[in-house]
Amino acid sequence: QRQMCIRDRHPSWGATNTGGAWLCAHLWEHYLYTQDKDYLRRIYPVLKGAARFFSSTTVQEPSHGWLVTAPTSSPENSFYVPGDSVTPVSICMGPTMDVQLLTELYTNVIAAARLLDCDADYVAKLEVDLKRFPPMQISKEGYLQEWLEDYKEVDVHHRHVSHLYGLHPGNLISPEFTPELAEACRMTLNRRGDEGTGWSRAWKINFWARLGDGNRAWKLFKSLLHPAVDAATGGHGSGTFPNLFCSHPPFQIDGNYGGAAGVGEMLLQSHEGFIHLLPALPDSWTAGNFRGMRVRGGASIDLDWKDGRATRAVVTALVPGKFTVKMPASAVRAEVTVGGHTYTYKKPAFSLDLNKGEEATVCFF
């Protein structure tokens, strides 16, 4: 028997029922970075169990026949139903965040089952269910729609931007592959604004990095580091405490981890199936380097840049594999040295077949 319950005082956040799917995303991401099949075998029952739970709790939406979660909410925002601009409503069917989470979960379970060569019949069922999920929708004003219907939001500046999960940390939305949805996310973020609690600002740093806007991400990162304690009054708000703990307020470590993740997203991304160097470099970060940052597929990256342009990278394979590198926008060609041999590549990308421990040194011109 599978059960869930609404937690505590208010359904706007207590009815968030897809947290288990979000947690499963972390398990799958660990596999993507390590490519550890033994680990995948250990976590597969958890992924499959979560998918089975949601398969048994989703229902058919009456207007379109979509498969949706219900009852649920889009944390922690509320909306007005047509004809009533007074009463905030939270409980709904199939909010966009839930659709994104279950799409991601089912897709990951299918991929894991195929890698482990198991559960072919169950994979077929999940593939059918995936086709029944609602599409992500753009509102009449151009924003990414938060609910199945184009409802009016109670708070257009709400600190939560739950329906952008598919942009980050998910990978369902990107400027490269879904430009219209990415633009809808951009408009949504501009409408919500940059203000918010510490963790909210941290999440927005990651959003803007995924959209390729390093200057906006950097602006938010600086606001995240703004002193949380008012020197004159002793009161505190959003920002950072003197000990560098992030202030919600009060202290919540989400902002610390999220802010650090945002810097990583500004410098290196790999969620789209290729290695993207300096995808959201702020104009003010004219020169720098990093060492040992990891990418999906099982590689480590070192990178140097100068005058805002990538100059040299080292790709080290931690497992055998094929690694695709997108050419930086500022580069005309890349000279890649592997095993004493040098190869020249031009845009848009190049692929490296590397053995475990093998390095490829890349110079950009």
Please place each PLM-identified region on the residue numbering.
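Well-ordered alpha-helical scaffold segments within catalytic/enzyme domains
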Residues: 22-36, 53, 57, 101-117, ...
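Long, repeat-rich segments with strong aromatic
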Residues: 154-216
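Non-catalytic C-terminal accessory modules of carbohydrate-active enzymes
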Residues: 56, 215-365
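Long, low-complexity segments enriched in small/aliphatic residues
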Residues: 123-164
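Acidic/histidine-rich catalytic neighborhood
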Residues: 49-112
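Long, well-ordered core segments of solenoidal/helical folds
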Residues: 1, 46-61, 130-141, 184-194, ...
